Swiss-Prot record:
Note: Although this enzyme belongs to the family of MTA phosphorylases based on sequence homology, it has been shown that conserved amino acid substitutions in the substrate binding pocket convert the substrate specificity of this enzyme from 6-aminopurines to 6-oxopurines.
UniProt record similarity statement: Belongs to the PNP/MTAP phosphorylase family. MTAP subfamily.
UniProt site positions, description: Important for substrate specificity: E163, A216
Enzyme kind, highest EC tier: transferase
Ligand binding (phosphate): R53, H54, T181
Role this protein plays: Catalyzes the reversible phosphorylation of S-methyl-5'-thioinosine (MTI) to hypoxanthine and 5-methylthioribose-1-phosphate. Involved in the breakdown of S-methyl-5'-thioadenosine (MTA), a major by-product of polyamine biosynthesis. Catabolism of (MTA) occurs via deamination to MTI and phosphorolysis to hypoxanthine.
Pathway where this protein functions: Purine metabolism; purine nucleoside salvage
Protein name: Probable S-methyl-5'-thioinosine phosphorylase
Top-level taxon of the source organism: Archaea
High-level lineage: Archaea, Methanobacteriati, Methanobacteriota, Stenosarchaea group, Methanomicrobia
Gene Ontology biological-process entries: L-methionine salvage from methylthioadenosine; purine ribonucleoside salvage
Keyword Transferase belongs to the record: yes
Protein residues bound to substrate: M180, N204, Q205, A206
Species of provenance: Methanosarcina acetivorans (strain ATCC 35395 / DSM 2834 / JCM 12185 / C2A)
Amino acid sequence: MDEEAEVAEIAVLGGVGFNSHKDCESHPVTTPYGRITAYLTSIKGRSVVIIPRHAEEIHIPPHRVNYRGNIWAAHSLGAKRVISTNSVGSMRGHPVGSFVVLDDFIDFTRSRPSTFHDDKTVHVDVSEPYCPEIRASLRYSLEKRGISYTEGVYACTEGPRFETRAEIRMMSQFADVVGMTGVPEVVLAKELSLCYASLSIVTNQACGMTTQKLTADEVTEVVGKAQASIFKILSDAIGKIPETRNCMCRFAKEGACL
């Protein structure tokens, strides 16, 4: 990787409605997976790149997001830490607008590219998928602001449709929240030995948990109202992340290649 390209320590992958990059410097990045628009800024004295997950010209649906391009762009700009934001439906009755710090995931996706290694076998270890240091920083930030949160398991579905009641009944046996974008991001980050963690906001109750019809409007409405809060949480967390990585994420790819 060209040293001149290493302009960021930390990457933020913004989900639906995330617009905290609007006043930042645009920085297009060419990757093997296409062109990615990134935004450079400084938060709490740390160099940060913000990458809108769904792009901007159009809202790319979750099953067609350029996950490889986004993670590669973060890596190519020098980021070793990645924080993602995503919206989730709750299968545990979490209040709408509340936050979940993810601690594990289950993958129900089907057709999206999920690895950088199509021509060789790489069995990357995901026994601890989310970086403990970033997760600790997120918990610190939430607690500092007196914001209630939970930790939980994330089920990722293919989308773009919402889930059926039967699917939610099945997934609720194993997971706490459900979304459409957290995988393969987390795996791709592991393949590049990056630290990765997610801050999820509950935007609705999952299908069948209430009698209310699920709509995309409620997702954008909840996230829109929480924009200022999300940015403050991320800012405090970014300032708390250790400058030197002491977690095992940096060794994720060791011994993985056949």
